[in-house]
Amino acid sequence: MQGHKQYKNTVSARIINIATLAVTLGISAILIAMATSRGLQKEIQNKTSVFNGHILITLFENNESQVSVLPFEDNDLVRQKIRENKNIKRFHSIALKAGMLKTNSHFEGVLFKGVSSNFDWSSLDAFLTDGKFPDLSNTISKEILISETLARQLDLKVGDQTDTYFQRQSNQGLPKKRRFTVAGIYFSGFPDIDQTLLYGDLRQIQKLNRWEKNMIGAYELFVKDFSLIQNTTDQIYNSIPSELNSIPIFDRFPSIL
C-alpha cells in the first residue's frame, strides 16, 4: 500500500513537472513569438522610413496622391522652421512622378523619385548591391538607381541605358521620353518598393513638369526620436504656411504600427 502511494506521488510529481514545463515552454514560445513579431515590425518600420521619410510636408492637394500633382515653393522660411525643430535629424526636397521604363523587349511601370543634391545617400548604403549612387552634384544628372527586381525584369545592369516615358502634365499629346543610365542597383526586400521605385535627379522632374527651379513636390523629414514623431509632426504643422500639411509616416503606411 505504501509503495502504491509512493508510486502515485511520483507519477503526480512527474505530471506536475511536465505540466509546469509545458506552461513554461508555452510562455517562452509566446514571448519569443512576440519578440520576433516586434523585431519584424521594427524592421518593417525602419525600412519603410528609409525609403519614405518619417514626416512628409506637401500641399493638401497632394495628400491622397502617390505622385506630386502640384508643386510649391522651396523657400528659406519653411526650411528655417524645419531646422528649428530639435527632433529633426535631416531633410531634403523631393518630387514623385509616374513613368514607364522600356527596353527593346520589356517595359515596367515605375515611380520616379527625384531627390535634391543634399539627399543623404549613405542612408541607402545597406541596400546597394551593385554600382554606385547617382551623382547629383553638378548639372542635371541622367543617372538613376533602380531595384534588383526592375533590373532583372528589364535585363538591365550597371552602365546600361534605358528609356523612360512620362505622361505630360496636360495629359495631352505623346509621352515625354528621357534616356537614363543605370548608376546603381539596390534591394530592399520589400516588393512594394522594389517593384516600382527608382531614384533620380529632382531637376529632371522639374524640367519634365515645366516647374520653376525653386518648385518641389515635398520635403522629406527624418527625426531623431521616432517615439516623438506625432508631437514633432504637430509642431511642424503649426509652424509652416497654412497651405502645407505635415504627415507622419504611420498615416501614410498604417501597417507599420
What positions do the PLM features span?
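Extracytoplasmic
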Residues: 50-52, 105-110, 139-141, 157-159, ...
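Mechanotransmission and gating elements of multispan inner-membrane complexes involved in transport
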Residues: 174-257
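N-terminal Sec/SRP start-transfer signal
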Residues: 1-27
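The feature marks short, hydrophobic/small-residue-biased sequence motifs that occur predominantly
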Residues: 95-138, 182, 199-202
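Alpha-helical membrane-interface segments at transmembrane helix boundaries
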Residues: 22, 37, 41, 253-257
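Hydrophobic, regular-secondary-structure patches
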Residues: 30-111, 135-139
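Soluble periplasmic/extracytoplasmic beta-strand elements of cell-envelope proteins
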Residues: 56-58, 92, 109-114, 143-145, ...
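Mid-to-C-terminal secondary-structure elements
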Residues: 121, 148-195
